[in-house]
């Protein structure tokens, strides 16, 4: 589900569409989703409305750390307190290929990125947000490489199986 496209590019979607065995790639938008999304089942139902067979579900988990502790929720004021400490932003993008009809998980992929520096450059919320977006983009790019590998394996296994049934 893309409610806001912060890190995804048209090139990313073109890369996914070019994978073997992919007939088309589309994003599920908010119109197809309930007001309060509660489960992967609801995402699968939305993908089914678009006649999708497999949904690539991914999530971004971003955490902010200083040398002494995990900081959340992150604000410029919070990092300003730790100006002499080294801070890290760590983002992991986890993805799963899920059968729209059955919920079967065909495979998973993951990418992680880290940005580390002294806290003092992250004094404004805009600077913190820019660093967050950078790590999220890098994690997503890393996950895309793993997604391509996983999909190639999934496609090879299941296309062989369905071809044998014909």
Question: Where do the PLM segments sit?
Answer:
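Structured segments of extracytoplasmic/periplasmic soluble domains
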Residues: 15-22, 46-53, 61, 142, ...
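A structural "domain/chain start" motif
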Residues: 1-26, 153-166
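Solvent-exposed loop/turn segments at secondary-structure junctions
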Residues: 32-34, 61-66, 114-118
């Amino acid at each position: 589900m893309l409610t806001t496209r912060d890190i995804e590019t048209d090139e990313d979607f073109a890369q996914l569409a070019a994978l073997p065995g992919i007939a088309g790639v589309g994003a599920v938008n908010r119109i197809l989703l309930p007001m309060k999304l509660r489960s992967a089942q609801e995402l699968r139902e939305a993908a089914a409305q678009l006649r999708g067979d497999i949904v690539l579900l991914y999530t971004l988990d971003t955490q902010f750390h200083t040398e002494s502790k995990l900081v959340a929720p992150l604000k410029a004021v919070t990092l300003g307190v730790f100006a002499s400490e080294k801070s890290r932003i760590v983002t992991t993008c986890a993805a799963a290929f899920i059968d729209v009809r059955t919920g079967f998980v065909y495979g998973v992929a993951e990418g992680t990125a880290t940005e580390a520096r002294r806290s003092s450059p992250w004094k404004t919320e805009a600077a913190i947000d820019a660093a967050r977006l950078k790590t999220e983009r890098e994690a997503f790019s890393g996950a895309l490489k793993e997604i391509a590998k996983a999909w190639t394996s999934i496609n090879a296994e299941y296309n062989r199986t369905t071809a044998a049934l014909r």
